[in-house]
Amino acid sequence: MDNKLLQFLLRIRNKRLNSYMIAITHLGTGGAIWLITTFILFYLGYRISSVNIILSLIFNGIVCNLILKNLLKRKRPSWISKVELLIKNPKDFSFPSGHASSSFAAALTISFYFKGMGIIFLIIAALIAFSRIYHFVHYPSDVIIGALLGTVIAIVTKNVYDSLLLKYLQENMGFLFAFISYI
C-alpha cells in the first residue's frame, strides 16, 4: 500500500501541483506556520492557548523527532528509490513524520481554544502531512502514525496543562502568571 500510493503520486506530478506542494511542505518545516500563528495569538492576548501550543510542539519534538525516529530508524523512501526530489532530502529518519505530528499537535491544540479556526488549521495540517508523501520523503504510514501521534500529544498536553501546570502557575506563581497575562 505504501509503495503503490507513492508510485501513483509520482505519476500525477505536474509543475503547478509541484509548486503548491513545495509551498505547503515549507509551511510545516521547523513548525514555521505553527510558531508564527502562536506568536500572533500571544501578541493578540491569547497567552494561555499560546503557551499550550508551544508545550505541545516541544513535547511532540521530544517524542517524535528525538525518541521515536532514532529508536525505530526507518529509512525514507527517498533514500531507497532514486527519485528526483523537489525539496531537500531530509537527513533524519522517516517514522513517524515530524511534519505530520507537529502539524496535528499544533492544529488540534489551536482547535481546542478556537473552534471556528480549528477546522482551517486541521486542513492545513492534513495538507502539510500529505505533501510529505507527495515529495517522496515519507511513506503514507509514517504520515498516518505521525498525525495520530500529534493528536494524542495535543490531547495529553491539553489535559496536563489544564489540570496541573495551569493550576500550579495560578496558585504558586501568581505574580508571574499575572505579568505574562498582562504583556
Residue ranges and their predicted role:
Residues 1-32, 65-92, 168-183:
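N-terminal transmembrane-helix/juxtamembrane module of multi-pass inner/ER membrane proteins
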Residues 21, 25, 48, 52-56, ...:
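Alpha-helical transmembrane segments of integral membrane proteins
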Residues 27-44, 119-124:
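Hydrophobic alpha-helical transmembrane segments
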Residues 29, 44-45, 72-73, 115, ...:
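Short helix-capping/hinge motifs at transmembrane helix termini and TM-loop junctions
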Residues 38-62:
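Interfacial segments of alpha-helical transmembrane regions
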Residues 41, 64, 68-73, 111, ...:
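Membrane-water interface at transmembrane helix exits
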Residues 56-69, 125-132, 154:
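Alpha-helical transmembrane segments of multi-pass membrane proteins
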Residues 80-183:
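Membrane-embedded catalytic cores of phosphoryl/pyrophosphoryl-handling enzymes
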